[in-house]
Amino acid sequence: MTLANNFVTYANLIVTALNSMAARFITIEYVRKNYKKANLYYNSVFWGNLIIVVVLLVPAVLLIVNLQNCINVPSDILWDVKLLFSFVFLGFFLSTGMPNWDCGVYVTNRLDRQYVPTMMTAMLRCVMLFLMLTILTPHVWYVGFASAMVTVIGLVVNWYNTKKLTPELHITLNDRKPMCSRKALRELVGSGLWNSISNVGNMLLSGLDLIICNMILGATSMGVLSLSKILPTYMQQMSSSICSAFAPELVINYAKDDRKKLLHDILRAMKLTSVVMTIPIAGIIVLGDYFFALWVPSQDAHLLQILSILSILGYMFTSGTQILYNVFSTVNKVKQNSIAMVISGVVSVCVTLLIANFTEYGLYAVAGVSTAVNLVRNMSFTLPATARYLGFKWYQFFPQVGTTVLSSLLLVAIGFLIKPILPGGSWLELILSATVIGVIGLVVNIYLVLNAGERRYLFGKVRQKLGR
């Protein structure tokens, strides 16, 4: 399954270049009620994706037909694997070849209409796999089949959302010719390519550490580092999810050219992000040794905790400012950010190689250098650059860094003060201790980070969700 997904990942590199900025361009024109231009982008993306599907369809079919000549597959499961690849590619071609229906919830800032069905289809996928594997004769292609069915359901949900929320967006034929603009495609691909380059920089920052560790320090050290990254990885995923939730609001306010509301919403989003993100930071720093002692009792829990802390230390400064990464795509300045990402990635790799080769701090260097380089880039480029791009003073967002640091330090201090009375000898006790720290951290953050108006906004949102 992983190998099949890897082939789709390679194909997605092409699709990403066209699609990664589509929602931004469509949203701006739609919010400004320039529906004709919004539809021009909407249609151009669709026809561009359709061309990609047609181009990739033949190689995909040839790969599946001649799979045994391309990779080593045991003959007794050859047809299983071919069916698996077929369903994986089917899901890819369906999601790519259909119109950009997921932009409907983005344009109207109704991501909840996508998140809830996504969770439900993920559960449905698990149920389908469980039933197929228990009732029927087990086959590996069931995994691909379940994924393809979930993709179809997701497409239907997205189609309904787009039709309901943005009825002005539709695929159009002018005089039986597709509504498509080469200029729009060049604009979309030009910006999207820089997003792909930014991903290269991100890979240099965090995607090569295990390889470097393996090459210089050996497989054992790589295994230790890999274990230590499990919690930081979840932190990174959590940060990305939170930041993406605020992206539509940012683009909509930018399209309306309402600088006052734009700044108000950004500062509020930064504070809410800080409220949420600093709690797991404190949890990892305080209870990380308990977690690793339970998860991998044969390993050095203290070492794993230190390596994890080195990986997340930057979030103590920037967890509240993570949403500023959305600014680059909002104002279409992705080129500048991509260059900064690649430069910082190259610097990180070079410094890591030097320290790992010529000092005794190799393992700590691999875990911590990228964090330090990331922090320097954020402080020297991301914060001042995003403020200037939005028309504010370069230091506009720096006070939030101080608030985030204060919140992190206070929660960590409280955590260590109560740690002696917190149990951690079993998973149930660890969950209980983490819950205690989480509740205390949430209460402290709500009153430390948020002002009275922001607290009313937060409580109102909670009551609104609970009342549904």
Regions found by a protein language model. Give the residues of each.
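Interfacial/gating helices of multi-pass transporter permease domains
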Residues: 1-12, 41, 140-145, 183-191, ...
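Membrane-interface junctions at transmembrane-helix termini in multi-pass inner-membrane proteins
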Residues: 93-120, 130-131, 141, 309-344, ...
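Transmembrane helical elements of multi-pass membrane transporters/channels
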Residues: 121, 146-165, 179-252, 271-272, ...
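Hydrophobic alpha-helical transmembrane segments
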Residues: 86, 116-169, 229, 342-349, ...
